[in-house]
């Protein structure tokens, strides 16, 4: 068994546990179409979580359990903060799925890539804009030198 694959699968599973919790919080502050989006995302993350539990077992691992509660990145008190939370959940999941894509091969890599794509699409739906490479930390481009380095 490849420990890197198992570790990445466990991280994705932990991310899905957090997403299920987070969407439970966010959904309580949304109504109408946004509440419907949150419910769909909640169900999708439950399904991914269940699939990842099977994957971890198939990798001879013991699936990481959900925490009793999760620290939210900011207070969620209204629809705007609930939408921000949903976008944050998806962005974080894109990161763990990018790691799983990098570690896995074959069918698991394909499943992780599909989950990464879905998280990126949901993130854009929640926040209205996307990033060039979902799941990869945005890095500032190095500054170009304005003049050649001085030579001794």
Regions found by a protein language model. Name each.
Residues 1-152:
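All-alpha RGS (Regulator of G-protein Signaling) helical domain and cognate RGS-like helical scaffolds
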């Amino acid at each position: 068994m490849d420990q890197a694959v198992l570790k990445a699968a466990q991280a994705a599973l932990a991310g899905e546990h957090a997403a299920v919790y987070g969407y439970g919080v966010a959904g309580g502050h949304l109504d109408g179409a946004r509440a419907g989006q949150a419910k769909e995302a909640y169900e999708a993350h439950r399904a991914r979580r269940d699939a990842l539990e099977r994957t971890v077992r198939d990798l001879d691992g013991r699936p990481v359990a959900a925490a009793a509660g999760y620290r939210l990145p900011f207070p969620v008190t209204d629809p705007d903060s609930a939408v921000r939370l949903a976008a944050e959940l998806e962005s974080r999941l894109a990161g763990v799925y990018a790691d799983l894509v990098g570690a896995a091969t074959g069918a698991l890599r394909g499943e992780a890539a599909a989950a990464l794509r879905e998280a990126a699409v949901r993130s854009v739906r929640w926040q209205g804009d996307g990033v060039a490479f979902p799941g990869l930390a945005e890095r500032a481009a190095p500054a170009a030198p304005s003049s050649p380095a001085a030579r001794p």
